[in-house]
Amino acid sequence: FQMDGMDGKLTLPFTDGEKWNAFYYRTRANVDYTHQFDQLDLNIAGNFGLSNFNFQPESVNSKQKFTSGDFHAGIHFIDETAPLHFNAETNLLMYERQHNMFNESEANTGIKETIIRTKGDVTGAIGDQQSITIALEMNNLLYSGYTKNVSTGDEYFKNYTTLLLNPYYELDNDDWKLHIGANVDLSFGFDKSFRISPDITAQYIFSDSYIVYAKATGGKQLNDFRRLENICPYGELPEANTTATLGYVQRPYDTYEQINGSIGFKASPYPGLWFNVFGGYQNLKNDLSYLGFDPSNIHSGSYLTFAQDNTDNLYLGGEISYDYKDILGISAKYTYHNWDSKTEEYLLAVKPVSEMSFNVRIHPISALNINLGYD
């Protein structure tokens, strides 16, 4: 169980010291149980979340509330001597956004999202060093509430299904670690599509402490309500493309990572010391971002709204770490990004140009751990 939040006066930018009585409260509750049988683990879990917060003055909505809950049940086959291994799980995820329009005069504008997620995989061993796996995931997304224009019947949130098939081959020996597969993504209904992206990783180890690696991955990123909250809780859903009645919103399209390819080199020239340098390229279709909007000629307020465009990302980085006898650990990482958008460059304003992290862990005695970090 966890509760955290803030309540205080913040100075608004671009004003003569105007204050905002801001608050943001989060509540999280979790329960997780695992029962171990002879050859199977049964896991049952549940989660609850509640976020209450307000917007700055003169926003189109004054406050917002997110309520979420989910239930998980899964089995995990643990007999390592068996020729086949499998995992299976089912999840029920529920989420409600309470306010979803540009006019709070209507009392009930909540939108509820329900996701039924089923996942499973089967792995067959080929000797001691090789295996083949077939993984499958299906998401059924259902919407209710303020999802359509009752006057015209136009529907802006449509139920749909996504299906992910991920077959791959793995090799693991003293010199090579290979993972070769593909992500096959299908969507039915809203955002109907068929897409394929790579799922490949290769590592070559030499002299026991030097590694050359390359990887190319991708796949669908569901822009469900949970992801929207993680990206920008203050963001409003995009306005529906309708001129009949203002104030209706629609769901963003899902983001698809067509490729995220990188190459790198890891080395440990001294015991306990590791460094890693890497570079790569990422291509995102319908990349989700957000921007500030002041629609003074249409609505009576300003707001942040989610928006999308295709983006490219070139990145370079490095990291270094040192561990001394489980007493001292130091690590640092830096990544530089060069983002590009062909049509909506203003959406890149919230993209990170660089990311840096630094962590120190001190374990002087068995009963004491000291951690210091910066991100």
Where is each model-derived feature located?
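Residues on the lipid-exposed face of transmembrane beta-strands in outer-membrane beta-barrel proteins
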Residues: 1, 29-35, 71-79, 118-124, ...
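Flexible loop and strand-edge segments within Gram-negative outer membrane beta-barrel domains
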Residues: 6-32, 36-117, 145, 151, ...
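Beta-strand-dominated lipid-handling architectures at cellular/organellar boundaries
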Residues: 61, 105-108, 112-115, 121-123, ...
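Transmembrane beta-barrel strands of outer-membrane/channel proteins
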Residues: 1-7, 44-52, 88-96, 134-142, ...
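Short loop/turn motifs that connect adjacent beta-strands in outer-membrane beta-barrel proteins
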Residues: 36-41, 78-86, 125-131, 172-175, ...
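Surface-exposed extracellular loop regions of Gram-negative outer-membrane beta-barrel proteins
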Residues: 1-11, 131-146, 154-188, 326-327, ...
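Exposed, low-structure sequence patches enriched in small/polar residues
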Residues: 177-375
